[in-house]
């Protein structure tokens, strides 16, 4: 056998041109395992000389690592180590790929070389006893000197059963039908002794994994969470007691306090209640402080520091000393704010001093009206007094007690009963005492048009309408003669503009229409549509201006002709979608 390895070169192992296709690129580096040689020799019962002549192609299997390969003797080993051309190339991509003998980290050539120092050679020699090998005639392998010296004894390993996978559990689509749940305690119904069931099941299935789990759990200290399992069902609690009593003789079950301190795993069949064991107290240690309350004293701070944080978080009943969190503002604070506002309002001497700045039109007009209240009546100058700094007059307090609208209505009724007819539109009017009182011209008092023959000597304040511009108010006639003169000389310009299409009189702006007359205008909406489409209905009762979408529908219906009596001619155009009359489109 030794002469076989010495005299046979590397190229003799190939059996023709087909041997390269059946072997991988590293077959020249590794020799077949000794078990394959012994099995082939014992099965064929041929001699060593016949083995030299038989050159059949060999298929080497590198997937099994249980049997160690036998290295070549010194001559062949030196030939392998001496020739650099026989070494494997840097990249195997240029060689033919064989999926059967693919490289893995476990079956690489480097791994097989390193495994020689860890596997004993006593067992493989027993397989080669038929070839005349013995422990004394074992050749000396030079590659062992180059490897690290490790003990050649291997401890026999007992095959361990791996834990079954959870893929066999049919969790979806119906979690209620769990046929395999009894085999896996971690997916079964939650009980008080789920931890013991899981640990014992791991111990019976795989003892080494159970030892690892036990070592890891020994360093873990569960959090002390009291009163977490108080609301459990009595059935599950009794069931846990029975199982602990039955297994106490065989296993060392932990105490009940350790179960109470650990959180229970949520079951698949029963969803976890997210609102369970929540407290009504605040999560902050110190209670919130509102302005009516006093800040926490030293006694309350000592009480909060001595109290356990975990007890305050998970207690079902709040103690009497703790203040319950209330998000609503206290009534005492509301009354205090009202009182402070009343004191602040009474302390101001002027009535408009406490009025805040506002952009409201009504509020500004009321403020101006109250500031000029001395000219609202004929005898107001002698009766109205300026309020003192410390005390407000009785009349001013009565005015502020009523609303603004009631104040204006009362002033209007009083003025109609006491007003006198004026024959001239002079700015000054005589009073009963014969004295002339000059009317102060105020730019903030707008003038409204009153067609009544009698005009009061003060302006009626319009609360709901904005003030007119000075240009428009100057055009309006104040007296009877002025109105007659204006009506006799020129027509009134107070004509209401109406849209010629939709007959609307309210529009933010007016746009030109198809009519050459300037009075015929369109509102903003109709003007924008006519600017885009340039189409209008010729029916005087309709005059609808279509939109762009309506124009497309009208175009799909086709062009039609119709005689229009107003124009005394036949017009060609589209049909109106609203009245089915002919329309006119003006080209730009």
UniProtKB/Swiss-Prot annotation:
**Name assigned to this protein:** Transcriptional regulatory protein ASH1
Q: Which GO terms describe its molecular function?
A: cis-regulatory region sequence-specific DNA binding; DNA-binding transcription repressor activity, RNA polymerase II-specific; zinc ion binding
Record GO biological process:
chromatin organization; negative regulation of mating type switching; negative regulation of transcription by RNA polymerase II; positive regulation of pseudohyphal growth by positive regulation of transcription from RNA polymerase II promoter
| Comp. bias intervals (Low complexity) | 417-433, 470-493
Q: Where does it primarily localize? A: nucleus
In the record, Phosphoserine modifications are located at: 56, 465
Biased composition annotated in UniProt, kind: Polar residues: 99-109
Answer yes or no on keyword Secreted.
no
Q: What else is known?
A: The ASH1 mRNA is transported to the daughter cell before cytokinesis where translation produces the protein to block mating-type switching. The ASH1 mRNA 3'-UTR and the mRNA localization machinery that are essential to restrict accumulation to the bud.
Supply the Pfam families for this chain.
Answer: GATA (PF00320)
Q: Which gene encodes it?
A: ASH1
GO CC annotations, alphabetized = cellular bud; nucleus; Rpd3L complex; Rpd3L-Expanded complex
Q: Where in the cell is it found?
A: Nucleus
Where are the GATA-type-classified zinc fingers? 499-526
Give me the ranges of the annotated region Disordered: 85-109, 377-398, 417-495
Which segments show compositional bias classed as Basic residues?
383-392
Is Electron transport there in the keyword field? no
PROSITE patterns the UniProt entry points to:
GATA_ZN_FINGER_1, GATA_ZN_FINGER_2
The cross-references to CDD domains, in alphabetical order and at most eight, read: ZnF_GATA
Give the source lineage, highest ranks first. Answer: Eukaryota, Fungi, Dikarya, Ascomycota, Saccharomycotina
Q: Which InterPro entries match?
A: Znf_GATA (IPR000679), Znf_NHR/GATA (IPR013088)
Source organism: Saccharomyces cerevisiae (strain ATCC 204508 / S288c)
Instruction: Say which domain of life the source belongs to.
Output: Eukaryota
């Amino acid at each position: 056998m030794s002469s076989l390895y010495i005299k046979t070169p590397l190229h003799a192992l190939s059996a023709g041109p087909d041997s390269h296709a059946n072997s991988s690129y590293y077959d020249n580096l590794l020799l077949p395992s000794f078990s394959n040689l012994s099995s082939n020799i014992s099965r064929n019962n041929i001699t060593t000389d016949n083995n030299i002549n038989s050159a059949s192609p060999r298929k080497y299997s590198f997937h099994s690592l249980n049997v160690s390969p036998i290295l070549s003797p010194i001559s062949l080993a030196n030939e392998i180590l001496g020739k650099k051309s026989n070494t494997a190339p840097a990249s195997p991509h240029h060689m033919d790929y064989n999926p059967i003998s693919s490289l893995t980290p476990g079956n690489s050539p480097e791994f097989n070389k390193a495994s020689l120092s860890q596997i004993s050679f006593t067992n493989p020699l027993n397989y080669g006893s038929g070839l005349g090998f013995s422990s004394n005639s074992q050749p000396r392998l030079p590659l062992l000197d180059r490897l690290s010296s490790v003990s050649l004894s291997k401890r026999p390993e007992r095959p361990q059963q791996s834990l079954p996978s959870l893929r066999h559990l049919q969790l979806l689509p119906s979690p209620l039908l769990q046929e395999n749940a009894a085999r896996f305690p971690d997916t079964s119904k939650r009980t008080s002794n789920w931890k013991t069931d899981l640990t014992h099941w791991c111990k019976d299935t795989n003892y080494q994994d159970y030892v690892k789990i036990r070592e890891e759990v020994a360093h873990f200290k569960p959090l002390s969470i009291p009163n977490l399992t108080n609301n459990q069902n009595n059935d599950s609690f009794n069931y846990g007691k029975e199982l602990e009593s039955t297994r106490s003789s065989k296993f060392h079950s932990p105490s009940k306090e350790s179960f109470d301190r650990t959180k229970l795993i949520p079951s698949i069949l029963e969803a976890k209640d997210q609102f369970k064991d929540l407290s009504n107290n605040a999560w902050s240690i110190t209670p919130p402080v509102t302005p009516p309350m006093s800040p926490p004293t030293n006694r309350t701070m000592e009480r909060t520091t001595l109290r356990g944080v975990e007890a305050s978080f998970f207690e079902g009943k709040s103690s009497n000393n703790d203040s319950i969190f209330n998000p609503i503002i206290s009534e005492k604070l509301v009354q205090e704010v009202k009182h402070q506002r009343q004191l602040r309002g009474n302390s101001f001497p002027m009535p408009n001093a406490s009025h805040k700045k506002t952009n409201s039109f009504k509020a500004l007009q009321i403020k101006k009206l109250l500031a000029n209240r001395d000219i609202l009546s004929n005898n107001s100058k002698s009766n109205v007094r300026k309020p003192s700094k410390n005390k407000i007059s009785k009349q001013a307090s009565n005015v502020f007690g009523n609303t603004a609208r009631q104040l204006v209505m009362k002033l209007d009724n009083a003025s109609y009963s006491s007003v006198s007819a004026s024959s001239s539109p002079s700015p000054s009017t005589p009073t009963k005492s014969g004295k002339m009182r000059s009317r102060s011209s105020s730019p903030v008092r707008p003038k409204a048009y009153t067609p009544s023959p009698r005009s009061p000597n003060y302006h009626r304040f319009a609360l709901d309408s904005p003030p007119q511009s000075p240009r428009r108010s100057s055009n309006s006639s104040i007296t009877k003669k002025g109105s007659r003169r204006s009506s006799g000389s020129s027509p009134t310009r107070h004509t209401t503009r109406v849209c010629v299409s939709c007959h609307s009189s309210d529009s933010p702006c007016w746009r030109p229409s198809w009519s050459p007359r300037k009075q015929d205008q369109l509102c903003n909406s109709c003007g924008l549509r006519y600017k885009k489409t340039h189409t209008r209905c010729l029916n005087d009762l309709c005059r609808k201006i279509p939109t762009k979408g309506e124009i497309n529908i009208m175009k799909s219906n086709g062009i039609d002709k119709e005689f229009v009596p107003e124009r005394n001619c036949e017009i060609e155009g589209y049909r109106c979608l609203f009245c089915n009359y002919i329309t006119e489109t003006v080209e730009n």
